[in-house]
Amino acid sequence: METILKIDNIEKYYGNKSNMTKAIDGISFDVEAGEFVAIMGASGSGKTTLLNCVSTIDKVSSGHIYVGGKDITTLKGNKLNEFRREELGFIFQDFNLLDTLTAYENVALALSIQNVPAKQIDAKVRAVAKELEIESVLKKYPYQMSGGQKQRVASARAIITDPKLVLADEPTGALDSKSAKLLLERLKHLNEDLMTTILMVT
């Protein structure tokens, strides 16, 4: 099986020598294609820091992270932007949807940035919307949607580009128990039926 994500002895420090906080201390693990891996731990244990390093929002202090065999800790500028755009999908706790765009436009945005033709964008958005049961909200703005609907729209946006890896940062944190259960079922569906590789922090 193909290794999608390889974490190789990474460390992350904050502060300076006299006042240093070690957020990640020599972590190594692999995630294979098609796996759904959940990282659990107490608040402040470094889970989100780890996800930020994998997503290139933050840089590791030492060690290496490989996605699809590519060492992402060495990427800069356009190469880094291209990697984020084409190989990663993000699902955030607070959704991060653009308030001025409809659900359809939020989901389509990632493909528009890649200059995908409009007909292909439309077909793909509608296919993903059907999978995640958000067809009825495609014309709505975020303020017109429930928390569960917003999270499913955010999930659709995350997978629309067929990324190698989807990163989910406490995706159920802002949801009630019913919506949280539904979202986890959707993520399971993405993983099992669409073979999406998922790394989730919870």
Describe the residue ranges of each PLM region.
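ABC family nucleotide-binding domain
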Residues: 2-202
